[in-house]
Amino acid sequence: MIKLIATDIDGTLVKDGSLLIDPEYMSVIDRLIDKGIIFVVCSGRQFSSEFKLFAPIKHKLLYITDGGTVVRTPTEILKTYPMDEDIWKGMCRMVRDELPACDYFAATPDFCFAEDGGSPIFHLLRDSYGFEMREVDDITRLDRNDIIKFTVFHPDKCEELCTPVFIPAWNKKAHLAAAGKEWVDCNAKGVSKWTALSYLIDRFDLLPDEVCCFGDNLNDIEMLQNAGISYAVSNARPEVIAAAKHTCAPYWENGVLSVLKSFL
């Protein structure tokens, strides 16, 4: 019996970077919640973006944000998994030195830091994704212990550019995962979306077999592998489809919505 449903957003429910979602999702999710199912939004997005996307039912959901590094209710942070300062600052310096074509940002549970308020990444995150942004002169000069994610950005081939040097340099010191063609997300070592879901499973005294997950990209693989029921949308990467127990129609055909309706 399914007691908790968790879904990714970008590429799974909507087009990457969109704040437009089929409104039928809201009514179907609301009915599932009325049946006693816990519904979790589980994305690489910031809380403010997830909150805006699900506005009609936002106070009924639980939120896993920033790729599994923050777990929260609509009003309270339950758990965070911060990065070591030396790690995210070292990553920042390497992108500057080795990947001049790429940009980057550092995230706290409530907002993100970027270094150029006029840059494409700043406008993309603020205007398309609905993120709360802060402009700073130099991210490496920040004195903070609440950085939970460092992300590298390139509009077309971030994973390709990061593969020769950046990923080998850091993949034993942090959890790295491609999140679409534009992003490589970096979390504290061992921290993924499944880490955050495991926290909720323990909190609600559930079993993995009572959990259903939906996803499309590499940062979804752990939760798709470990959940009792899991679906990759058919537009997902081949590795993700292989990790999931089932496949559903692509996001533009509302594949996840069809599966959710079958649970009513």
Please provide the spans of the model-predicted regions.
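Conserved acidic, metal-coordinating active-site core of Asp-based
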Residues: 94, 101-214, 218-226, 235
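Residue-level signal for inorganic ion chemistry
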Residues: 32, 67, 150, 197, ...
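Non-catalytic pre-domain segments flanking phosphatase-related domains
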Residues: 1-7, 30, 34
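Short, structured coil segments at secondary-structure junctions
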Residues: 57-59, 67, 169-172, 226-227, ...
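Asp-based phosphoryl-transfer active-site loop
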Residues: 3-18
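Short active-site oxyanion
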Residues: 36-40, 59-61, 148-149, 209-210, ...
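Asp-based, Mg2+/Mn2+-dependent phosphohydrolase catalytic module
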Residues: 226, 230, 234-264
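Active-site phosphate-binding/coordination module
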Residues: 20-122
